[in-house]
Amino acid sequence: MTEGVLWPELNGDVPRWQDLRVSLSSGRPSTNPPTFGTFRNGLEMWSFSASQVQNLYFEAQMPHGWVLGSEIRPHIHWSPGNSTNTGAVMWELEYSWANVNDPFPASTIINSTQAAAGVAYQQQLMPWTPISGTGKRESSVFVCNLSRVGNNAADTFTGVAFGISVDFHYQVLTGGSIEEFPA
């Protein structure tokens, strides 16, 4: 095998994008959780109400191969289920991000709206504002709260919105860190 053909990112010259994926089926319900119910046929996912704020909690740890200090681009994959409504859904991400051996700072809230495509069961991807990675290191951890803000005037989608996953796009130049536990 020619070096750099199978793993061209190991050349370290051109940043590549990777996904840090969080499956919402593993999210922890809050005191006002969405309903885990039928999405399509025998498939189930979390369905978020159109009339209230419902949320799930999760965590995510930055990989060792991440380009330190580069921005992180969070987004959600979601679906309108069987609805053909074209109203907008407001998704909110509250997070606190800390390095190993650092205290978690006060949380930050970012939100965004996206119109449903009007196509039943379509998978949609909605980005949030990028998050600065300045000062963050490998193994830093996000503690997160995902909400659909169904009671907000900007949320005009009248059906339930199904949450599939939250992803954080990040850049890599290598396959990982040299140290197992980077300082």
Language model: regions and residue ranges:
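Cysteine-clustered segments with highest specificity for TGF-beta superfamily mature ligands
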Residues: W128-I131, G135-A153
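Proprotein-processing/basic-patch segments
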Residues: V149-A183
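Extracellular carbohydrate recognition and processing domains
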Residues: N101-G135
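N-terminal leader/pro-regions and domain N-caps
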Residues: M1-Q52
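Short beta-strands within extracellular/lumenal beta-sheet-rich domains
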Residues: A50-G65
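Extended low-complexity, serine/threonine- and proline-enriched intrinsically disordered segments
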Residues: G87-N101, V166
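Short amphipathic, basic-aromatic surface patches that mediate peripheral association
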Residues: M62, W78-N82, G150-A153
